[in-house]
Each structure stands twice: as C-alpha cells, then as structure tokens.
Amino acid sequence: MKEVEIKGDTTVINANAFYTPEGAYLEELLKRVPGLEYEKQNKTMTYNGLPIHEINVNGESFFGGNSTLALENLPAKLVSKIKVYDKRSELEKITKVRKGGENYVLDLQTKREFNGTLITSAGIGIGNNDKKETELISNLFRQKGDNISVIARSGNRYKTSRYPDNRQDNVAMNFVKKFSKRFTLYGNMMYNHYASGNESTLYSEQYLTTGNRYQNSASTSTNRNTMGNGSLGMRWSLDDKTYFNIGGNFSKSKSDNTSDSQQSTSSEGDERINSITRNSDSKSDSHSFSVNADITRVFNDKGTSISLTGSYSDSKSTNESHSLSETTYYQLESSLGGDSVLYRNQYQHSPSTNRAYSVGINLTQPLAENLRLQLGYRYSANRQVSDRSTYESEVYQDSLSNYTQSRTYSHELSLYFNYNGKRWQVNTGVQMHPERRSLDQKTGLLYADTVRTSVNWNPQLNVSWHQGKTRFELNYDGSSRQPDLGSLVSLTDNSDPLHVTHGNPSLKAAYSQNFRLMGRNTRLGLSGDVNFSNTYNSQTQAVFYNLATGGTETYPVNVNGNWNMRASLRYQKRWKKRFNLSARTGASFAQSVALVNEGKSEEPDRSVTHNTSYNANLRLGYQPKWGGFDLQGDWRYRHATNQLRSTSNYTRSYNFSLNTYAELPLGFLVKSDAAYSFRNGTNIKKGEDDQVVWNLGASWRFLKKKQAELSLYWSDFLSDKKNYYRNVTATGLTESRTSQIGSYFIISFKYRLNKQL
C-alpha cells in the first residue's frame, strides 16, 4: 500500500510507512504524517486545513470523540491505517441523505496481529520539583468494531506553572459491543479531577486618538474542578427495513476558583487614571442530561423511508462568587478633595436552569438511481431561567441584581437533494426556521419584557468531483442569526463599574456566509484551499470611553463591512521510503468594523481594522530503521492597520526545531527535541524575544520480551522556556506571561503485557 491514497471521499494513510520510537503513543505517529497538524496547547487538530473533530477506532467512536484521550493513550504500534473522511450520523447513513455540516474524523484501523489482544501497561514515575505520575492503560480491539478501553492516570508530569499543588487525576472507560449484525451497544464513563494555579502578568496598550492608554496587571489564581460524565447508546435493526437508534449522556461538575489581582491604567506621560485591587473566589455546581432517539422505516428496495426523531435535555447550575475590590480614580476628586475611591464587598448567587425538547419527521424519496430528496419538519421548545442576586456588604442590592426568563418556540422546515455519482457528488438543501421568542427581565427596580417573531434561513451546497488521484470540492454555507434577547432589552448592567453594558431594541438579524474551494492531487503531492466569508448586519459593541475613570460603556449595534479571506497551498513528497518533505504556505486578510467614541462627539466613529498575515512552513524528515530525524522551520508575519487612528502594528516570528531519536542495542533508546523561537515587532523588548526549549529522554527496555521499561525524561534542560501570549491589532496590543518552573526531570518504570483472548 502507498503512503497516501484517495478512495472516493476518503483519504487512506498507511501508518506502517511512518516509523515511531518503541512504546510511542498515537500523538507521536500523527506528528510524522504529512498534512496532519496538532496544536497541543488548545487541543485542535487539522488535516490539510480541515478541522478534525474526533478520533474513531475501526469505525466506532472512541470516548465520545475525546481526541486527547486517544492521542495520549493509544499505542502507535496498534495502527495499520488511518482513514480521514466526513462522518455521517446514523440517521444519515440509513437514509443516505447528507444534511449539511462537517464532521471530519480520523478513523484508526488496528493491525490484524493485535485483533483480540488485550494490551496493558502500568507505570509509575517520580522526579524533582515534586513531579510524579502513575498510570494504567488497557485496550482490547477487534477489527469488526468491538472494543473496550480502560485508562487511569494521576500526576503532574506536564504541568509547568509554579503552583505547587498542580495535579490531574483521570479514570475513563469506553466500550463497543456488537451482539449481532442487528444490535450494537456502546458507551463511556469518565472521571476527572484537577487542581491548577498560575502566577501571571498582563500588559496592554490601547491606541486612542485622544492619547494612548496603558494597563499593567499581575494576578495569582487557583482552580479546582471535579467532573464526571458518561454516555450510553444503542443501534438496533429490528428487521431489514426498520432501524432504531437511541443515545443519552449525563454530566456533573463542581469547581472552586480563587484570584488575587492588581491592575493599573495610565495615559501617555505616565499620568495615572485608575488602579484596582481585587480579591475574588467563586464556586459552581452543575449537572445535565440529554437523550436523543430516532426510528426509520424503509418501505421498498429503492429506499423510500420515513423517520421520526426526538430529543430532550435538562441542565441546572448554581454559581456563587465573592469579590472584594478597591478602585481608585485619580482623575476624579472626592468630596474630601482627594482621589475618588470606590470600595465594593460584593457577593452574587446565580442559579440557572435550561430545559429543551424537540420532535421531528423526515420523508426520504429516491427520484432516480443516484438522486434522493428529503423533506423534514421539526418542532422544538426551550425555556431558560437565570436569577442573579447581588449583595453589597451583606445587603441585597436591587440595582446590581438581575432576573431573566426566556422561552423559544421554533419550527424547522427542510428540503434536501443528494446526488451520488461515480465522479460527482452534489448535496444541497435549505432550512427555514420560523420562531417565537419571549423574554422577561428585571434589572434592579426596572422591568422589561419583549416578544419577537422571526424567520431564520440556512442554505447549504456541497459539490465534489474526483477522478483517480484528483479531488475538488466546493462548499457554501449560509445562515441568518437573530440577536440575543437580552441584547434587545433597554436595561443597564453596572455590576462592574468599569465595564457598564446597555441593551438595544433596534438590533437586526445578521446573515453570515462562507465559501470554500478545495483541491488535492496525491500523485503530485499538492493540495490547497481558498476560503471567503462575510457577515451582513454583524453585531458588535459600540464602545464609549470615559477618559476620567478609564472605564467603558457599551451597547450592541449592527454594522456592515466585516469580511475575511484566506488561501493556503501544501506540498508533500516522500522518496526511498526514508525521506519526507512537506511544505506549506498561506496568507489571509480580514476587515473588521467597530464603533468607538472617545468623548469627542455624541455619536461613535466607525473604526475599520485591516489584518494581513502570511505564513510558511518547511519540514524535512529522515527515517532509517534505527531512528528518525525531523527538521522543521516555521515563519509567521502579521500586520494590522486602523484607518480611524492611523496606527500600524506588526509581529514577526520564527521557529526552528529538530526532533531525533535512535534505537540502540540491548533495548536502549535516546531521543531529543529542541526548538529555537525568535520574534520581533511592535514593542517587543530585548530578553523577551527568543527562547530555546530542549527536552531530552532515554529509556531501557529489558526482560525476555522487553516488557519492562526504565526511562528518564528531562524537560526544558536549559530552563529557558518563556510562556508568552501576544495579540496585536490596530486598536492595541496585549501580552501575557505565566511563570514557569523551568527545568525538571522524572524517572519512570513501566511494565507492558499483551494477552490473546
């Protein structure tokens, strides 16, 4: 089998063509697949620019789509092939009608030699900086789809902030059992407890025509969360023409958070505007459950069918927060002649409930051998209640409290056409959503209610063509969106004195649309895409600045002119089964519109920002039988301009990395990954512009079948890691930094056992 093949709308990747170190997990394998990119920090994954939503194993869902559990716990040696495709729901598979929306998945196919083998590993580790870890991982997969997995982990190996009590504990189980060709039961359960904390600083600049504004803040925060969730479902073919699917899930979580912060705002010339000292803590408790079901009856061999659908969900949550703050306004004079100071000792209790249900019917009718039509109707209802009670120094405050109750009743009428030929596939449809929404809201002593009827539209089009190793696809997706009911009510929320918000009953519905063209040829190793999106009547916040206090007042408004486009081109080449070359380049442009008022006029001014970015990536890999080398270079440039303020900013960043490993005699393995990062641009200081992060590892596998492993991992060997996050726009810039523990090591012992069942 070749490294990459296209079969219809499915891309098949030969996992055996990409070598990984002995004992590596799935994440290590995917790093070596051209076109696959995984951002570990934000847990997102893409393949040739397409977002991957979940990981499946042998066609079945794995932990309800929790990709992180698969990436960090599935052994790479299990996988023979990786399929990438747009996964359809069970109802869409039965009716053979695609109803829009994308759900790209990685479907892992396990090797035959591991079919029916229980693969278990257990390990323990300890290191400096109070590092520790324990784990137990057990997987059993059968190629027909049956599987069971148990994962238990505890420790703080990858926690790098300075908080001493960092820890995460996970226990999870997933199973799929096919009792027959007609009946399948599947489910999962997960428990997660984590404690984390951060010491961070934030610097921001805001560019105003009346003079720039600068803000510095420092904070210490802790977070503790305990969560449990699970799901259970079944697929049942009552006979050859009747299909029933039902699934449900539940979750329960508790959290406890604290934060201590100091913040100071000044203008040009270092003239102080305000300063805030705040201590806060909050607790939350929530639980929810939902159930979905559908039943389909096929009437003839052509595929004429009728489907009934239903769903119900219920959730409740309670939030409690306490905040003690002192705000000093240096530009306002108090009655005693000094600076004005606002003290607040505020407690909030905020319970909320959300309940929704829906019922629907779909009629599917084949019009020709490859052409199907589907008519659908669905009725849904939703009720939400939230009640925020605010107390100031233990005295109830009407003006800072808020009660909201909303109801939504909607109808969905849908029409879809699907054509599925040998080379062409066309899926098109439109949804119409008439709805009635009502809102009762009380803020302080003011009461307001509103009722709004509207119609939303959602047209969709997907056209694809493929021949041999070439595939093109065109997508269009449009949707109208009504403004949030709370934004339509003319009430004021001043619970935060520096960020006061208002409503606007004149808001209009927004309409967003997205066009995307993709192309790929596996023989040439080329792929690319072009995207364009824009929004009519986009909702944004008109911002009024109070130059004396440094605060803002906002209210929602509609604006036009928001649009963006981007394009990317990728190249992949593999030769002699050892060398791999991949390259990527791209560019994007975005225009965003806002309304701002800096106190110079009654009406806000139109502020237009242009963001332009370019990127390029080059990667070269060499994989001999005894190891691997991966050299990568990355360049990114971003430039932003604002027409109202005539300001301009840019950020340029470079990253070079080298990942290597070598398998040595007697079961030894050494590995190293090093990355050098450098950046320059607007207001980037010397000493904060570069870093070298070098991680080292070594392991020894011993005993008769190499079941035991002793390993050493040394993170950030040079203790040079800097955790910076920077965002630059034409209206200003923000940069945050989180303190790191620096270099640390951990020594681990692991034992593996494979048993054929």
Regions found by a protein language model. Name each.
Residues K2-D260, S280-N319, T353, G360-N382, ...:
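Membrane-proximal, glycine/serine-rich, low-complexity loop/turn segments characteristic
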